[in-house]
């Protein structure tokens, strides 16, 4: 019993250390970004490869990229501010206006897409006959230099045009909507030439591996990298190292590709009915591409055709992502314990709907979890109380048999059988709480809803550490009290080591998200009340007997 409890406590400390280490990776100071040249000057090697099964006379159009004649088109909605480069029609900068970088910088929005430093841009174009199709190095024309969603306006259309000078005109239109992070893209091919037009639409995300991604953790961690969804695999991570080791080549309907990071993502969603081909490429300087291209489209001379795709660039709002594409909500990555984490998230959302405060939602989720495990905890606490009652007899056995461990263990097990006490019963709450603890950790870390969410008084961001360490100190005190209610180990070395556990946990929890510490404090307080009551009842019954 003592050894098992000791091992469980050591394991829990190790688990806490690994979670703390990952929190430091996610929230700690990042290394200075290395200056990077503008992504528009990259070589044409970032274009998709010619499809291996395409037998037509098709080549990848490799118009030399240059900045000459290009300009930036600025687009503003109520939730997005972005820049589109006429060189390629790329989305080269995108700010999320409702998500400030930090509480200290409320007027500085998160910049999800950028072509500076660690570049992250969204690109699109066509694969087809040379000089007959535009790609993301081609020069497009725009009617205006700025587009803004006006009061009373719900839809904003941003058109760009390209012509081959031989009768083929392509119009790329970005369609943005009020309150939405979803951008529809329509590419209309108007073929007024004398020959049929053939091409494949592609859309891709080009990103430099962030400096922080070079730090490795041997435990589950917040993921930054590529993601693929197909009919066969609902959520497949394509890490930067996977892209570096080999190119992806997969076909599927109802698929999508994405680059995700903490709280936010950008994802291209091709038409669900098309069998798209999904690919990756590794470029120089740790720059990677993940994308998709469509089946070949043929536009006869004298006709036109519109090809569509959707780009989501914004926060990982699960209820929003569920309505865009199957499996897209999984980008809020709760890890291997998603089956537990999703109900916890649903409970949090439900209570937040009542209280409009994520702190109170966490407290009431804790109450629900405690209620679900009440009977289990009651049985465990009764076992621990009975163990505490047996403590004098165990000490007596220890003194009687001294260093003879075999005889001592035999006598101890005989005592347990005689008193009808389960020595393992007190360990069950710890085992049960570990997956719940991990699941809640990832819900708090991954859910953008809780990002910078205030609670009360000094707790103005439940996703970050307590600035004054009040909650971790309260948690340490609660652990100390709870430890006093438990039977101490008969082994003096283990007893001395376990005395330091509240202090060690307090140090670890100093740097944990305050929302997680809030859960642990409330859980400990409820456990103390329950355990104290059960112990008191057993002591009263013993006194009467």
UniProtKB/Swiss-Prot annotation:
**Record's subcellular location:** Cell inner membrane
Q: Does the keyword Repeat apply?
A: no
Q: Name one GO cellular component term.
A: plasma membrane
Name of the protein in question: Membrane protein insertase YidC
Q: Where is this region: Disordered?
A: 32-69
Q: Which InterPro entries match?
A: Membr_insert_YidC (IPR019998), Membr_insert_YidC_N (IPR028053), YidC/ALB3/OXA1/COX18 (IPR001708), YidC/Oxa/ALB_C (IPR028055), YidC_ALB_C (IPR047196), YidC_periplasmic_sf (IPR038221)
The record describes its membrane topology as: Multi-pass membrane protein
Name the protein family. Belongs to the OXA1/ALB3/YidC family. Type 1 subfamily.
Q: Which Pfam families match?
A: 60KD_IMP (PF02096), YidC_periplas (PF14849)
Which Gene Ontology terms cover its molecular function?
membrane insertase activity
Q: What is the lineage of its organism?
A: Bacteria, Pseudomonadati, Pseudomonadota, Gammaproteobacteria, Methylococcales
Question: Transmembrane ranges?
Answer: 6-26, 354-374, 425-445, 462-482, 500-520
The GO biological-process annotations, alphabetized, read as:
protein insertion into membrane; protein transport
């Amino acid at each position: 019993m003592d050894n098992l409890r000791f091992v469980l406590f050591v394991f829990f400390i190790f688990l806490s250390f690994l979670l703390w280490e990952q929190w430091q990776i996610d929230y700690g100071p990042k290394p200075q970004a290395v200056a990077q040249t503008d992504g528009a000057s990259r070589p044409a090697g970032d274009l998709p490869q010619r499809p291996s099964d395409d037998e037509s006379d098709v080549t990848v159009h490799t118009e030399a990229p240059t900045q000459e004649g290009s300009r930036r088109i600025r687009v503003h909605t109520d939730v997005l501010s972005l820049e589109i480069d006429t060189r390629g029609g790329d989305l080269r900068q995108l700010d999320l206006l409702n998500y400030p970088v930090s509480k200290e910088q409320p007027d500085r929005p998160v910049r999800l897409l950028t072509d500076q430093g660690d570049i992250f841009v969204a690109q699109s174009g066509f694969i087809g006959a040379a000089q007959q199709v535009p790609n993301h190095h081609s020069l497009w024309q725009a009617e205006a230099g700025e587009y803004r969603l006006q009061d009373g306006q719900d839809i904003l259309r941003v058109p760009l045009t390209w012509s081959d000078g031989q009768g083929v005109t392509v119009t790329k239109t970005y369609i943005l909507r009020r309150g939405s992070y979803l951008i529809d893209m329509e590419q209309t091919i108007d073929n007024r030439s004398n020959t049929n037009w053939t091409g494949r639409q592609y859309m891709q995300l080009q990103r430099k591996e962030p400096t922080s991604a070079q730090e490795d953790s041997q435990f589950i961690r917040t993921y930054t990298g590529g993601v693929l969804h197909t009919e066969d695999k609902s959520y497949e991570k394509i890490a930067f190292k996977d892209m570096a080791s080999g190119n992806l080549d997969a076909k599927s309907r109802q698929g999508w590709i994405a680059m995700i990071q903490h709280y936010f993502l950008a994802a291209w969603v091709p038409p669900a009915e098309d069998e798209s081909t999904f690919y990756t490429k590794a470029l120089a300087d740790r720059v990677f591409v993940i994308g998709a291209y469509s089946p070949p489209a043929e536009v006869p001379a004298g006709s036109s055709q519109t090809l569509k795709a959707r780009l989501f660039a914004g926060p990982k709002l699960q209820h929003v992502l569920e309505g865009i594409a199957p499996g897209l909500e999984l980008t809020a990555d709760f890890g291997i314990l998603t089956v537990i984490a999703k109900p916890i998230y649903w409970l949090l959302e439900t209570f937040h709907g009542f209280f409009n405060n994520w702190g109170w939602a966490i407290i009431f989720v804790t109450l629900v979890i405690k209620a679900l495990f009440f009977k289990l905890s009651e049985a465990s606490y009764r076992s621990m109380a009975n163990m505490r009652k047996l403590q004098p007899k165990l000490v007596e056995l220890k003194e009687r048999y001294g260093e003879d461990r075999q005889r001592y263990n035999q006598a101890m097990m005989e005592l347990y059988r005689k008193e009808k006490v389960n020595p393992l019963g007190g360990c069950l709450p710890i085992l049960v709480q570990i997956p719940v603890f991990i699941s809640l950790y990832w819900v708090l870390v991954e859910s953008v809803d809780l990002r910078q969410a205030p609670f009360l008084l000094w707790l103005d961001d439940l996703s970050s550490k307590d600035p004054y360490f009040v909650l971790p100190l309260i948690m340490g005190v609660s652990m100390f009290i709870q430890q006093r209610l438990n039977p101490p180990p008969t082994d003096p070395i283990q007893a001395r080591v376990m005395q330091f556990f509240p202090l060690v946990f307090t140090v670890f929890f100093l740097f944990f998200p305050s929302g997680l510490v809030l859960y642990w404090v409330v859980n400990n307080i409820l456990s103390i009340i329950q355990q104290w009551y059960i112990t008191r009842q057993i002591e009263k019954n013993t006194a009467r007997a």
